[in-house]
Amino acid sequence: MTAYAAIIGTKDNPVYELEMGPINEKLDRSLNSHLNQFIVHSSLDIVDQLQWTSNAFYMKTIDQFHEMYISAYVTPSNMRFMLLHQNQSADNIKLFFQELHELYIKTLMSPFYQPNQPIRSQAFDLKVRSIARRYL
């Protein structure tokens, strides 16, 4: 399982990033990390176009890069949840996004968090990793 999840803010800034999967060498991890960020960021234009043509929060596979697929989920507050993944079940990806959205809402309700700022909470990270293990 190789996947990269990101929460992108309303100003196209990364709020949270998570890389999952086996990569052994540091150099490969660094190059892979930058490539994942580039692929997801380049797909934001597609998400911006699709969000005006659909009422659904979840957008299945919006783009593809080699054997990797990009799925998206747009919240009512225009936060974009992006997932770069190998071919997975669309239902599992949708459930992953829904639980991530619930977790993000709980974070938003914290008086110590400002919207569009990076999420650095270890508890948030552990919960997202748990959700990812369950569905991805």
From Swiss-Prot:
Keywords: Cytoplasm, Endoplasmic reticulum, ER-Golgi transport, Golgi apparatus, Transport. One of its GO terms (cellular component) is TRAPPIII protein complex. It is found in: Cytoplasm; Golgi apparatus, cis-Golgi network; Endoplasmic reticulum. One of its GO terms (biological process) is intra-Golgi vesicle-mediated transport. SMART domains: Sybindin (SM01399). Pfam families: Sedlin_N (PF04628). SUPFAM superfamilies: SNARE-like (SSF64356). InterPro entries: Longin-like_dom_sf, Sedlin, TRAPPC. Component of the TRAPP I and TRAPP II complexes. TRAPP I plays a key role in the late stages of endoplasmic reticulum to Golgi traffic. TRAPP II seems to play a role in intra-Golgi transport. PANTHER family: TRAFFICKING PROTEIN PARTICLE COMPLEX SUBUNIT 2. Belongs to the TRAPP small subunits family. Sedlin subfamily. This is Transport protein particle 20 kDa subunit. It comes from Schizosaccharomyces pombe (strain 972 / ATCC 24843).
